[in-house]
A protein has these predicted regions:
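Hydrophobic alpha-helical transmembrane bundles of multi-pass membrane proteins
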Residues: 1-281
């Protein structure tokens, strides 16, 4: 998508910038990003007393289960006694890639690959991770104190990545050629509408997969809800509250359709803005 939106002379740079964020964020997510998620659901700096009693609190800084997910932990390697940690780690890693990719699209044609690599590590393995620990964690302080719920991490990812990108853009400024010598803005449209179209439909498909993957484990919540002797097996979201694949399907398709319809109407049928509005929906 981003390659199709960039000008021809920037195609290779845009492609490699987005490709190299994958190994950079993956390695740093392994080394410290995953640990940050488990270490700071209550702060740092907030009272550990807001934690759930079941939380394995190991320090005053609320390092809940952080010792499990250091890079040298047995759970961060091949372990025949552990079937899920790597899958759970990789699922969150996908969101880390997404956060870095959002920033990449916002600062298109304005930055070197090396500089973007630093930003990708910062947003993908540090800043969004802290945000997720606070608001997309079953013991996060935003959930416990504010009742915050974001079942699919939509705000957790896009708010922090968008704010991060805005801060970077305030320093970098507009794309070269965006304004004429008189200060009039120029429209820089996509250079390859077909790549943009294919890319956006791949993103749609990926988002649907994200939403479905947010139905994390299947639990018996009967005892949790006071139904002694009664089993209530259900999919759950990150907050361990019941959800269904049916609800996610309705939510995704209706929001996608609303975005496409609004984009088509506002942009008067322009494909780039129509498809982009579908993504916004």
């Amino acid at each position: 998508y981003e390659v199709g939106a960039s000008r021809y002379k920037h195609h290779q740079h845009t492609l490699m910038k987005n490709t190299m964020l994958i190994p950079l964020v993956t390695v740093t997510w392994f080394l410290f990003g995953w640990w940050i998620y488990w270490a700071f659901p209550t702060g740092p700096g907030l009272a550990p007393s807001i934690m759930n009693e079941s939380a394995a609190l190991v320090t005053d800084e609320s390092a809940f289960s952080a010792t499990w997910y250091t890079a040298t932990s047995d759970l961060m390697a091949v372990n025949l006694g552990d079937h899920i940690s790597g899958v759970f780690w990789a699922a969150f890693l996908l969101f880390s890639w997404t956060a870095a990719s959002i920033v990449s699209g916002a600062i298109i044609e304005r930055i070197t690959t090396f500089a973007f690599g630093i930003l990708a590590i910062a947003i993908g393995s540090v800043f969004w991770t802290i945000d997720a620990a606070w608001g997309w964690h079953f013991d996060g302080w935003m959930l416990k104190l504010l009742g915050y719920h974001d079942a699919y991490a939509s705000g957790v990812i896009h708010a922090i990545a968008g704010g991060f990108a805005l801060g970077v853009l305030m320093v970098l400024g507009p794309r070269i050629g965006k304004f004429s010598s008189s200060g009039e803005p120029r429209n820089i449209g996509p250079r390859n509408p077909w790549l943009v179209t294919v890319g956006l439909f791949l993103i749609y498909t990926g988002f649907w997969g994200f939403y479905a993957a947010c139905n994390i484990p299947i639990f018996d919540l009967g005892p949790e809800y006071g139904m002694e002797g009664i089993s209530y097996w259900t999919a759950t979201n990150i907050y361990v509250t019941p959800t269904t694949l049916s609800g996610i399907t309705f939510n995704f398709l209706m929001s996608l359709s609303g975005g496409l319809l609004a984009g088509y109407w506002i942009a008067k049928g322009d494909p780039f803005w129509t498809y982009s509005s579908g993504l916004a929906g």
